[in-house]
């Protein structure tokens, strides 16, 4: 599947956002002292990593 320049640009923007969110929630999980909160932040970080991986696969 051939992607247009606009599509590639959008995917790259989304990759940057997902990478930032993954790092942000991972950092919050590391800093959290409450176990439940730490688990939630970790799960959110993992979900954003999955989104990143899915988007990255589109680039081939």
PLM regions with names:
Residues 1-60:
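His/Met- and acidic-residue-enriched segments that coordinate or traffic transition-metal cofactors
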